[in-house]
Amino acid sequence: MGPFEDKLDLLELPSTYPLIPTRDVIVFPYMVFPLFIGRPFSIKAVEEALDNNQRYIFLSLQKDKEKEIPTKKDIHEIGVVATIIRMMKLEDNRIKILVQGVSRGRIKELKKVDDYYQVGVEIIEDPEVEETLEVQALKHSLKDLLDKAISLGKQIVPDLVEIIKSVEEPGRLADLVASILDIKAEEAQQILEILDPVERLRVVHDKFLKEVGILELQQKIRISAREAIEKDQREYFLRQQIKAIQEELGERDEKQEEIENYKKKIEESGMPDEIKEEALKQLKRLEKMHPDSAEAGVIRTYLDWLVELPWNKRTKDRLDLKIAKKILDEDHYDLEKIKERILEYLAVLKLKKESSKDKSIKGPILCFVGPPGVGKTSLGRSIAKALNRKFVRISLGGVRDEAEIRGHRRTYVGAMPGKIIQAIKQARTKNPVIMLDEVDKIGLDFRGDPTAALLEVLDPEQNKEFIDHYLGVPFDLSEVMFICTANRLDTIPRPLLDRMEVIRLSGYSEEEKLHIAKKYLIPKQLKENGLDEKTVEFSDKAITFLIRGYTREAGVRNLERQIGSIIRKIAKKIIETGKKRKYKITPSLIKKFLGAPIYSTEKEEKDEVGVVTGLAWTEVGGEILKIEVTKMDGKGNLVLTGSLGDVMKESARIAFSYVKSKAKELGIDPEEFGKYDLHIHVPAGAIPKDGPSAGIAITTGIASVFTNRPVRSDVAMTGEITLRGKVLPVGGLKEKILAAKRAGIKTVILPKDNKEEVMSDLPPYVRKSMNLIFVDHIDEVFKIALREEKKEVENQESES
C-alpha cells in the first residue's frame, strides 16, 4: 500500500489490534511517520502484527509519558489505526518502523495477551460534508497559508506539499495539515479527537494562521538583525580598508586605534549608563585633542581609572556556615563573639539570597578594638577567606588630609582617587572586605578632617552613591564589608563611632597564649624558617617560661618574635654543624639562646606603708600600677606627681577628703592632717596617666600612711571612689585581671557592679585561678588590704 493512496475500504479493517502507546508523538490518518520502539511490550506488539501478515497496529497517545507500563486509564481513548510499511532492527535492541495512519478509532476494550497489549477498536469514519462557501474558503485559505509558510522558510517535504494541494476532502486536508503543524502532542491529540471534519478544518486553520504569524515576525527579526549586521560589517570592511591603505602608506592612525580601544573597554566595563555617558563624553574630548597635550594625558588617566574599576564584578559569597566556621577556627583561637557575628551575617545573606524578594544586603561595618598583637588585622584576613572575598587593607595611621580618603579633584597636578577607590581597584571586585587599620590614629589639620570623609564611606544609607572627588561619578560601596581596627575608642569622633558595630578584643591569658603558641605561632615560624616539628619541639614548660620571662604584653606579637628568634638560632646551628637532629626546647635552652629573663613574675613579698598595687588599662592592655603615698611635715597640702591627668587628680582629692571625714573611725588624730603635707606619686613619671579607676587604691594608700598600717603586696585593686566611700564600676577589667595574673597577684579587689561583666568575660580557668573580691564600699577594701599597725621597731633600734 502506497503512502498516500486513496482511502482503504474501512469495512475490511479488523476489530482488534496490537497496541503501541506513543509518547510525545501523534500519527494522523494518511500521515507517514517513523517510530522508534524500545519497550518490550511494544516490540512484541509489532512482531505480532507482522507475524499475522495484517501489519496493522493501533497507536494511541500516553497521558503520562514518564509511565513505563501504562494501564487503560493512562492511554487516550481516541487513537489511529496504522499500517507498518517497513521495519528495521537497531543495535541497541530497539526497532524502527515506518507507519502510515489509516483511520481514527476508539478503544472499546484493552487486555494483555502474550506480553503485549491488544485493543478492541471501533473504527471512526469521517461523515460526508456539504461543500459550503465556508468549507471552500477554509480549504483555499489553508493552501494559501501553506505557500506563505514555505516562503517564510518552513521546511516541508515537496511531495507532501503537492498531495496537500491536491486534496479536497475537508477531514483529510485538516489531518494532513495538522501533521505539519509545530504544536505539542496534547494539542495534536485535541485535533485528533475532533470528529467533525469542518470543525477540525477550522481549528487547524486557526493554528496554522497563528504559526504563519510567528514565522512572519521571526522573518522580520531576522531581516532587522541581518541589516544591523550588514551595516556593522560594511563599517568594519571600510575601516579595515582604510587601515590597510594607511599601513600601505606607512600612516598607521595610532590615535584612532586608541579611541577604539577605549570605546571597547567602556562597553565591556559594565558601568551604569549615566557613568558610561560621562566616559564617552571625556572620550570625545580626547578625540579632539592633540595626543601629546597635557590635558590629553589627564583624560587618559581618568578613563583608565573608570574602565578598570569593577562596576559589575563581584565574588560569589561562600554561604556554607560550617566551612566558614572551620576557616575562622583554623586561623584564630577563641574570639567566639566575632566569629558568631560573621556567621550571623552569612546566615542573613543566605536567607536573602534564597528569598524571591530583595536579594541585596548591606555589608556590616565592624570595629575591632583591642591592644596590639591580639589578631585584629589577621582576623580581617580570615573573615575575607571565610566569605570567599578579596581582602584589602588600608592603613589610616597618621592620615591627615581628607583628600586621601575622598580623592583629589582632577584640576590638581598629579591628582589621584582616594584610598577607598584605590582599594576597590586593587580588589577587582565590588564586594571585597576592606580593613581600615588604626582608625583611632587619624590626624586632623588645616587640610580637612579625614574622619568626616569616612562618615559617608561607613554609612550604609549613603555609601551606595559614594562620589570620589577624582572620579566625579558615584560608585556603589554598599556591598563592601568594612572592618575598622583601633586600640582605643576615646580618640574616635562620636558620629563615626555611631556608624560602627564595636567588638572588643581583650588581651590573652597565659593559658590562651600557650594554646596559640602551640597551634599557630610555632608551626608558622617553623615553616617560615625552613624547619618542621620533627626537628624542633617546644615543651609546655618552655613556652610558659618564655611567656613569663620574656614577654609582658596583652597580645602575642612579641611572643611570636621570641619564638622566631629561637628557631632561627637553631637553623643557624644546623647549618654550622651540618647535622640535622631533633632539638627539644627547654627553659635552660631558652636562657642559652635569649639570655637571662627580662621580666620577673615574682611579686614583692614585703608589705609597705603607703605602697598600693593598682590596676590600669592602656591601649596596649592591662598594667600593674604602683601608687606611692607618703606624709611629711607641712601644713596639710596635697602634692601630686607622676604626669597625672585632671580626672586622676580629682580622684586623689576625693580620696584625701574621704579619709579626713572618716578620721575618727580609722583611728586617726584629725590634727595630723594640718601638721603634714601629703605626697602622692604614680611611677613612671614620664608616662601620662588619667582616669578614675585608681580611686580606691589612692584612698587605701592615704589611709595606710595616716594609720601606719602596711598594705598587702599580694592584693591589687581597681575602682572609682565617691565622697561617701562608694566603689563605682570601671572599664577594662578583663585586661586588668590578666595583668595582675601575669604579675603573680591572685587576689584582686573589684567593684561589685562589675561582677556580672567579669564573670561573663573571663574564661573559667582564669576565674578559678584568681581570688576575685567584689566590694561596694571602701571600708571593705580597708579590711582586706590593710594589715595591723606597723610597730616603730626601726626608731627604737636607732635610739639605742
From Swiss-Prot:
Please explain the role this protein plays, according to its UniProt record.
ATP-dependent serine protease that mediates the selective degradation of mutant and abnormal proteins as well as certain short-lived regulatory proteins. Required for cellular homeostasis and for survival from DNA damage and developmental changes induced by stress. Degrades polypeptides processively to yield small peptide fragments that are 5 to 10 amino acids long. Binds to DNA in a double-stranded, site-specific manner.
One GO term under biological process is: cellular response to heat
Q: Could you tell me what induces this protein? A: By heat shock.
Write out the similarity annotation: Belongs to the peptidase S16 family.
EC numbers for this chain: 3.4.21.53
Give every Lon N-terminal domain span.
17-212
InterPro entries assigned to the protein according to its UniProt record, in alphabetical order: AAA+_ATPase (IPR003593), ATPase_AAA_core (IPR003959), Lon_bac (IPR027543), Lon_bac/euk-typ (IPR004815), Lon_lid (IPR054594), Lon_proteolytic (IPR008269), Lon_Prtase (IPR027065), Lon_prtase_N (IPR003111)
Give the catalytic activity: Hydrolysis of proteins in presence of ATP
Top-rank taxon, per record: Bacteria
Q: Which residues form the Lon proteolytic domain?
A: 606-788
Q: Where is the catalytic site?
A: S693, K736
What HAMAP family has UniProt attached to this entry? lon_bact
One GO term in the molecular function aspect is: sequence-specific DNA binding
Q: Which organism is it from?
A: Sulfurihydrogenibium sp. (strain YO3AOP1)
A Gene Ontology term for the protein's cellular component:
cytoplasm
Q: Name one Pfam family in it.
A: AAA
Q: Could you tell me the gene encoding this protein?
A: lon
Question: What does the subunit section of this Swiss-Prot or TrEMBL entry state?
Answer: Homohexamer. Organized in a ring with a central cavity.
- Its protein name is Lon protease
Q: What is the lineage of its organism?
A: Bacteria, Pseudomonadati, Aquificota, Aquificia, Aquificales
Q: Which residues bind ATP?
A: G370, P371, P372, G373, V374, G375, K376, T377
Q: Where does this protein reside within or beyond the cell?
A: Cytoplasm
